[in-house]
Design a protein with these regions (language model features):
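Beta-strand-rich domains and repeat architectures in extracellular enzymes and scaffolds
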Residues: 29-52
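A short beta-strand motif characteristic of beta-propeller blades
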Residues: 23-31, 63-70, 107-114, 150-163, ...
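Blade-level signature of beta-propeller repeat domains, shared across WD40, Kelch, NHL, RCC1
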Residues: 246-269
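Short coil/turn segments that connect the beta-strands within blades of beta-propeller domains
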Residues: 43-44, 85-86, 129-130, 175-176, ...
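Bacterial Sec-dependent N-terminal signal peptides
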Residues: 1-26
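Conserved beta-strand positions in repeat-built beta-propeller and related beta-rich domains
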Residues: 48-51, 88-94, 101, 132-138, ...
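Short loop/turn segments that connect beta-strands within beta-propeller blades
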Residues: 59-63, 102-106, 146-149, 191-195, ...
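Repeated scaffold domains used in trafficking and secretory/extracellular systems
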Residues: 33-39, 75-80, 118-125, 163-171, ...
Length: 269
């Protein structure tokens, strides 16, 4: 079972206070460099794409744990999924191709979605059983494929389910559900057979992650959370030093802030 990719120290008023107090964030370290994007897995490994289009893995001790220099083999990479640290997914939308890397960032295999007549996919996600979810925006179906690209299951045609069809900004497999997020329509949740379960109309979120019974995201300089059981929605202003970021994530109790000169990492007290 894939572990949670996000463990945030967020417990009511405790985090609310910390969101208003910069001293509640302990500076740990900074990784200097010019990076365009990054991801963090559940083992605190950081995956960096620099301005020379190199993907580099830095482990929790700050040591280099892998380098992938062929990141632009299929053009600009659309998405990096590090849900499973042993199986890294690189998705190239322009070529409908998924490159699968091992934990050392060596190529394991390449999946050409076009061979399965899948031509329009905006987002992918590692599934609970180590396969791959995708939303086929041409057939309007949620599909699960294996490492050979074989379709293992698919949902009903969304045109038969929804009056207004969603487009996947992000997919996430967590808590026995698959979450499809459309920035203009909100969250759609499905069971592992592709059956629609629920919709949450939270719009314009970014850097979304789903932890134990909580959905997190960022929007307009704020951290947002939604409790799936209590249905409570909260928002917290980011501290002053987090302003004007290129990207921001809270993973494993740490705040990661990407700016033009590098990534700063803070422990949430």
């Amino acid at each position: 079972m894939i572990k949670a990719i996000l463990i945030v120290f967020l417990s009511g008023c405790c985090f609310a206070a910390s969101a208003q107090n910069d001293s509640s964030f302990l500076f740990l370290k900074k990784i200097n460099g010019s990076f365009t994007s990054f991801e963090v897995d559940n083992l605190d490994n950081i995956y960096l794409i620099n301005t020379t289009n190199q993907l580099k893995k830095i482990n929790a001790n700050g040591d280099s744990a892998g380098v992938f220099n062929d990141i632009k083999r299929f053009g600009p990479v659309t998405q990096i999924d590090v849900t499973n640290p042993l199986k890294i997914l690189l998705y190239y939308k322009n070529f409908s191709t998924i490159v699968v890397l091992d934990r050392f960032l060596n190529i394991r295999n390449t999946i050409n979605l076009r061979r399965q007549n899948i031509f329009a996919v905006n987002s992918i996600a590692t599934s609970y059983d180590n396969n791959i979810w995708l939303y086929d925006e041409q057939e309007y179906k949620l599909k699960k494929i294996d490492d050979d690209g074989t379709v293992l299951l698919e949902s009903n045609d969304f045109r038969q389910v929804f009056d207004s069809i969603p487009s996947a900004t992000q997919l996430t497999d967590r808590n026995n559900f698959v979450y499809l997020y459309d920035t203009a329509k909100g969250f759609y949740s499905f069971d592992y057979y592709g059956s629609f379960k629920n919709r949450l109309p939270f719009l314009h979120w970014a850097n979304i992650a789903v932890a134990e019974k909580i959905i997190y995201g960022f929007s307009y300089g704020k951290l947002l959370s939604y409790q799936l059981q209590s249905l409570n929605q909260k928002e917290y202003s980011l501290p002053a030093f987090a302003k004007n970021y290129m990207a921001v994530k809270i993973m494993n109790g740490k705040l990661y802030i990407l700016k033009p000169d590098g990534i700063s990492i803070y422990q949430v007290k």
